């Protein structure tokens, strides 16, 4: 993007201008693209995420440092480190007022987006009404509603809204004057760009919109798709849109919740849809797992390649170092070899050491001689006359030539360009403090703490308010005194002292004798200096050779003895170490074996006790199970008899009821017939016939019914006696049996416990 900076008048601004904050200093000028806290104040300042918001906050904190330099009047003009001329103090004033929120504004957008998603997924959710602010189409947001085609070679005109074009007069620079003009600290400039802001935005601008109540446009369901994250749409996004449409169509076919008759159908449809969604999610998860697996394999492969590359670099570096060391060592050996060979050849040429006269003809005929190539180690330097071949240059050897050469040089050679030093970058690309800056800050804090501790003035001790007890010093030890002894003890002490002197003298004499014996060869070697004649010198030389041979033999013998002793000591040490190791391991093994044996004995004893207790409990349990089985059998028998009697009663009652119903039906039929006959006979009968009918009814119905009732009552009384007797027999037998079983079980348990204790005592005595 190209920028053209122009200075404009305030009354005519048809182009889009940007206000910048410019600070001028003596060394130069520094222009910042925005202010420190624009991310909190400016509503048009947008950060992409909470991470960028935090980074902007950190940068603002670093730019607007709250550390203040306060001069020290005592050491104001000092340059010493331990006497600084100023101190750093943390300013309590915060440039951001407390009512300004420092939180990221994107959380509100996320909340509204979550409400929109909830309204899309849940049709019963009522989205709260949003109060939109004035978009200010003709105000500050006017540039957002412009539309202009991108024509790079088209003449730049104002946007589709035509305003009166104001002609800007060209700016003419005033003539330079010797008087220095005042430079303002702030300056407002306008910046005209070749492109609109929308052309360089990472995320295309989305205009504000208002959603009608109870309507969910399909376009809003795709609000989560942003540029680079779903846009431009691919195969996956198209499938997602198709699934969303199918789900909305399926939701439209669902029965209403108010229809209770279709509730089961709605539940089945929802379960089926949920199974389909879960199956789709499982497929997506499997795809993601496969993709992650491939990515992991690729990362592992790259890591292995990088590791191999690093290893190869290390190996190559090590190989190159060893190769350089080898070459250097070989070169040194080669130089030493050449020098030694040269010396040997020189010595071999003149073995007898005779002096030879120089052959000048031979020297001048041999071009490898020192006449043509003298050796510098012998003090000859053939390049002493090299100044004779130096080229004399006019421009380098004369002042006039240097002046002429300097006049042809460009200005920046003689007049160096002064560039403002770049600000020290103390943050990384991610917005975090660098390690060096953090260490500088920590060192400054430590230095400040040390200075505070060093310059801390001790407060004068205040007089005590109350009386204090003075500690009493401990008494000194008594001075030792020497008691006078008797003459006999004094003589004994003097004799002991004399004996000690004799012993010390003898020890010193022995040490001198041993030293003389050790240095006897050196003494004899010193004595050889007094031999002046040839015979004596030869004798001394032979003695010296014999002595040196003896010394070498002695040293060799001592070396062999020391080697043998070292080997023997090593073998002895290893044997002792192995023996002590074996003995310590055997001791530990025996201790562990005894401890394990004790644990085994204790576990065996506990096992026997538990087995005895378990056998007693098992016998009691078996006895109780037998009793319960007998009780259960008796109860089952009683239940079977009760059920059989109950079923018999039910069957009899059912038969009686059935017979009664059938009899009643037949009686009703017969009654109808008899009634018809009776009516007919009634219409024909006489008084005697009426008396005969009454007597027949009494003898045929009333008397048999009374007899039947009496018979039933007798049967019921007889059965009641038998039932009471059966109940008494059953309950009396069961209670006596249960009591008897309990007493027998307690007696058996006591006898078993006594037997187990006796067995345990016998086992302990045997062990």
From Swiss-Prot:
Annotated S-S bridges: none
Highest taxon of the lineage: Eukaryota
Tagged with keyword Magnesium: no
GO cellular component: axoneme; mitochondrion; motile cilium
Keywords assigned by UniProt, alphabetized: Cell projection, Cytoplasm, Cytoskeleton, Differentiation, Mitochondrion, Spermatogenesis
Membrane spanning stretches: none
Biased composition (Polar residues): 8-19
Mitochondrion listed as a keyword: yes
Entry's localization field: Cytoplasm; Mitochondrion; Cytoplasm, Cytoskeleton, Cilium axoneme
UniProt similarity note: Belongs to the CFAP91 family.
Protein name, entry field: Cilia- and flagella-associated protein 91
